[in-house]
């Protein structure tokens, strides 16, 4: 069976609305891509992480009247009348097989691997987290997730408690548990994230050591030895008082989801309470870590 796809650029705020609309008018799948054709990997709390320059790609049956699709998009007012788009025919493939072939085990730091369940574990003696791609899991990890995983791998988590603030799929909390943490707590504003984290913890045999809370139900006196938050710079600054109280004295803090250009302003929000390490950059993103005073 042949296919045809439409690709259009969108703002962050409108990308998900356009995705929903394309599905309503017949798209069999919709993918978010960044400017470098990288699919989305790790969701933010309550939403799909979208880059500032996001392409929305809708796949349709080859017999679809694409002129009508374009007209419907314009009529929806989700795009301008002269919006830039590209329509192209796609050769018939075994899409499920190709989709699965794109996912490979990935190593973070010295000990940690993230592996899809259908792939053979490269090193049985390593710390292996089995995580199957979902809607927001791309062909490679987003730099901010990689930065957080590498940081967790560098810590001695033996016997410690870890809070994953904005847990999404639970990947960071689960990795911490597999790396030796005694207990992990995942917090998110999205019930779907809580469900996904629980399912992924079950698949990795650590569900009995993972507590999950919606942000509104977070215990008032909650604290941990290690807190990691892979969200955006805005929320990291706005929620700084809350995040700071989650870290025990002499505890470790790891923050990401931050553009390198935003590092200074985020550091200013945490510097009074933490001895901060040098900022670590990966591509245009960065990680901020420190020890609570």
Curated annotation (Swiss-Prot):
Catalytic activity field: L-lysyl-[protein] + 3 S-adenosyl-L-methionine = N(6),N(6),N(6)-trimethyl-L-lysyl-[protein] + 3 S-adenosyl-L-homocysteine + 3 H(+)
Protein name as it appears in the record: Ribosomal protein L11 methyltransferase
Top-level EC class as recorded in UniProt: transferase
EC number per UniProt: 2.1.1.-
Pfam families documented for this protein: PrmA
Annotated positions binding S-adenosyl-L-methionine: 145, 166, 188, 230
Residues that span the membrane, as ranges: none
Keywords (A to Z) from UniProt: Cytoplasm, Methyltransferase, S-adenosyl-L-methionine, Transferase
GO molecular function, one term: protein-lysine N-methyltransferase activity
GO biological process: methylation
NCBIfam families tied to this protein: prmA
Protein task: Methylates ribosomal protein L11.
Family recorded in the similarity comment: Belongs to the methyltransferase superfamily. PrmA family.
Species whose genome carries this gene: Actinobacillus pleuropneumoniae serotype 7 (strain AP76)
Gene3D superfamilies in UniProt: Vaccinia Virus protein VP39
Compartment list: Cytoplasm
Cellular component aspect of the GO annotation: cytosol
């Amino acid at each position: 069976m042949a296919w045809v796809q439409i690709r259009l650029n969108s703002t962050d705020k409108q990308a998900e609305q356009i995705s929903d609309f394309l599905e309503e008018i017949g798209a069999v799948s919709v993918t978010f891509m960044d400017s470098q054709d990288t699919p989305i990997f790790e969701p933010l709390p309550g939403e799909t992480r979208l880059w500032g320059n996001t392409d929305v790609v809708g796949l349709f049956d080859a017999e679809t009247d694409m002129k009508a699709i374009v007209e419907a998009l314009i009529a929806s007012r989700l795009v301008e009348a002269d919006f830039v788009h590209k329509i192209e025919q796609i050769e018939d493939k075994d899409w499920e097989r190709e989709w699965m072939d794109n996912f490979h085990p990935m190593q973070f730091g010295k000990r940690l691997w993230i592996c899809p369940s259908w792939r053979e574990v490269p090193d049985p003696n390593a710390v292996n987290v089995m995580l199957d791609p979902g809607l927001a899991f791309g062909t490679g990890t987003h730099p901010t997730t990689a930065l957080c995983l590498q940081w967790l791998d560098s810590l001695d988590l033996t016997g410690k408690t870890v809070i994953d603030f904005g847990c999404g799929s639970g990947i960071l909390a689960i990795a911490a548990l597999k790396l030796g943490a005694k207990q992990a707590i995942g917090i998110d504003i999205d019930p779907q994230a809580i469900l996904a984290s629980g399912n992924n913890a079950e698949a990795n045999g650590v569900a009995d050591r993972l507590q999950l809370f919606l942000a509104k139900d977070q215990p008032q006196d909650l604290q941990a030895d290690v807190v990691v938050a892979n969200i955006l710079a805005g929320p990291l600054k706005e929620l700084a008082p809350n995040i700071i109280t989650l870290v025990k004295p002499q505890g470790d803090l790891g923050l990401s989801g931050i553009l390198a250009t935003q590092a200074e302003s985020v550091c200013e929000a945490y510097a009074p309470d933490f001895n901060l390490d040098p900022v670590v950059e990966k591509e245009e993103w960065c990680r901020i870590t420190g020890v609570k005073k």
